Swiss-Prot record:
Single Gene Ontology BP annotation: protein homooligomerization
Motif Required for dendritic localization, residue range(s) on this chain: 217-219, 496-500
Organism listed in the record: Caenorhabditis elegans
Family to which the UniProt record says this protein belongs: Belongs to the potassium channel family. B (Shab) (TC 1.A.1.2) subfamily. Kv2.2/KCNB2 sub-subfamily.
Protein name: Probable voltage-gated potassium channel subunit kvs-4
Keyword annotations of the record: Cell membrane, Cell projection, Glycoprotein, Ion channel, Ion transport, Membrane, Potassium, Potassium channel, Potassium transport, Transmembrane, Transmembrane helix, Transport, Voltage-gated channel
Selectivity filter (motif): residue ranges: 430-435
Extracellular side: 253-275, 335-346, 405-417, 435-445
One GO CC term, this protein: perikaryon
Region span, S4-S5 linker: 368-383
Outcome of substituting residue 219 to A: Disrupts dendritic localization
The protein's role, per its UniProt record: Voltage-gated potassium channel that mediates transmembrane potassium transport in excitable membranes.
Protein's UniProt keywords contain Lyase: no
Length: 503
């Protein structure tokens, strides 16, 4: 008897718990499966006040706070057909509320819901499932679907920009007013550069001898524009390599000749050595080519002030600056031999001669790899500045510690904090020349801390720099293809040109 009573109570309790769970599921949509959650949200009855309407939870398809008509607990097929449009795009099913499509007010889908099924612009209509079939790629339709939900057009990085343009044209959506700012803000600078490149022919048209100047400019600045431009670029690279080779070979004792006897600061005589005359002649030939190249570029340029300020042109000027100064001194009757007795002037002359090594940077004009490296450093300028600041702080901190710990030791070489700074830089960069080493136990502990901090400080920005390099490489990779594709869309709008450049 007691067991029967207990069993009945347990059954009653289980039935009560089940009823309570069903009741909670009706009140709280979080217990409803995800697939049915949309229908449950649309089944939420119309609330009476604005305060209650704001608290109605809806998802992306339905706007928050928007008043809904009363729905039954479960929508039937007839109600779904009246409120929704079913799409089958390339075998993948989509569903949108008709109110959402009307709210955007544009596109092929707007015509689809406003016309009868017989007059629809779909490729087919499946009467069994009430689906409109479109023989289009579903991966591209996701962009259109997101546009109807959010009102903006985003571009995934894994899709071809030309395909996106064609897909938007098919769905009769013009991206002028709907392109998301996040998808074009990064490319503003690149777009400005492209506009400038497209406007250069127009700039030359307004100048005297504009056509001739434009042809010469393309030969000098656009190596890929013609065969003459490629030949000119090859000659420039050859002259750069010859000039650098002459500078390097001129330092070999076997290729040097004695000029005259001179006295050093202590009064001792020494024989001054100079490179062989043949190397000097080669240097003059290279200088003539570089000067001709730079002068011709400035002569035919449509915007000389802007051309003068460009980095690569500044490098070209520095490469010929020693020769220009030497020629100016000769014009005024001053030779470099007369300046050798003046300590400061002779130092300036030597510094100007050292500037010849800058010519190796001229190769960056014809090397896409060097250009990518320069853009990577420019993109990583903030991270490099942060690393330099942290390294400088660590150098000052550890060098001061090791100086005061080591300066009183008889065998110590840490005679000053600047000397300790040199040791700290070598240590933190894990180079370790070994010319300065701590001898005390506290000094060695400080050295251990400097090594550990150096590894951490130098390792952290590396990942950021590599990431920036990958981004630069990714943007540079399709640059030529985008330029070609844009030329096939001469009437493309500004937004379409941005889409063509985003990947």
């Amino acid at each position: 008897m007691n067991s029967a009573i207990m069993q009945g109570a347990a059954m009653a309790t289980s039935h009560g718990i089940a009823r309570l769970n069903r009741h909670n599921a009706q009140r709280n949509h979080f217990h409803i499966p995800t697939a049915n959650r949309l229908f449950y949200q649309l089944q939420t009855p119309c609330t009476s006040t604005e305060e209650e309407r704001r608290t109605v939870q809806t998802d992306d398809v339905a706007e928050i706070g928007m008043q809904r008509p009363d729905y039954q607990m479960y929508c039937g097929e007839e109600e779904i057909s009246e409120q929704f449009v079913k799409l089958n795009v390339g075998g993948q099913r989509f569903m949108l509320r008709k109110d959402t499509i009307r709210r955007r007010g544009v596109g092929r889908l707007l015509d689809l819901i406003n016309k009868p099924v017989a007059d629809s612009n779909a490729d087919a209509f499946f009467s069994s499932t009430s689906e409109f079939y479109f023989e289009r790629p579903p991966s591209l339709f996701h962009i259109v679907y997101q546009f109807y939900l959010n009102g903006v057009i985003h571009q995934p990085s894994n899709l071809c920009p030309v395909d996106i343009i064609e897909e938007l044209e098919y769905w009769r959506i013009i991206p002028d007013q709907y392109l998301a700012s996040c998808c074009c803000a990064q490319q503003i600078d690149d777009d400005d550069e492209e506009v400038e490149e497209q406007d250069k022919p127009n700039l030359f048209k307004t100048l005297r001898f504009g056509e001739i100047r434009r042809c010469v400019w393309n030969i000098i600045e656009e190596p890929a524009s013609s065969g003459k431009a490629q030949a000119f670029a090859v000659c420039s690279v050859v002259f750069v390599l010859i000039s650098i080779s002459g500078l390097v070979l001129g330092s070999l004792p076997e290729l040097q000749v004695a000029t005259k006897q001179r006295n050093n600061l202590t009064g001792e005589e020494f024989t001054e050595m100079e490179p062989m005359p043949i190397l000097g002649y080669i240097e003059y030939v290279c200088i003539v080519w570089f000067t001709m190249e730079y002068g011709l570029k400035m002569l035919v340029s449509a915007e000389r002030s802007k051309t003068f300020r460009q980095l690569l042109n500044i490098i070209d000027l520095l490469a010929i600056l020693p020769f220009i100064i030497e020629m100016l001194l000769l014009i005024f009757g001053i030779s470099t031999e007369q300046l050798r007795d003046l300590k400061g002037a002779f130092l300036v002359i030597r510094i100007l001669r050292v500037l010849r090594v800058i010519r190796v940077l001229k190769l960056g004009r014809y090397s896409s790899g060097l250009q990518m490296f320069g853009k990577t450093l420019k993109a990583s300028f903030r991270q490099l500045g942060m690393m330099a600041m942290v390294v400088m702080t660590g150098v000052i901190f550890f060098s001061t510690l090791v100086y005061f710990l080591e300066k009183d030791e008889p065998a110590s070489k840490f005679h000053s904090i600047p000397a300790a700074c040199w040791w700290c830089i070598v240590t933190m960069t894990t180079v370790g020349y070994g010319d300065l080493t701590p001898v005390t136990v506290p000094g060695k502990l400080v050295a251990t801390g400097a090594i550990a901090c150096g590894v951490l400080v130098l390792a952290l920005p590396i990942t950021i720099i590599v990431d920036n390099f990958m981004k630069v490489a990714e943007t540079e990779r399709p640059a030529g293809g985008n330029r070609y594709r844009t030329s096939q869309y001469p009437k493309a709008t500004k937004s379409e040109q941005m889409i063509l450049k985003v990947t």
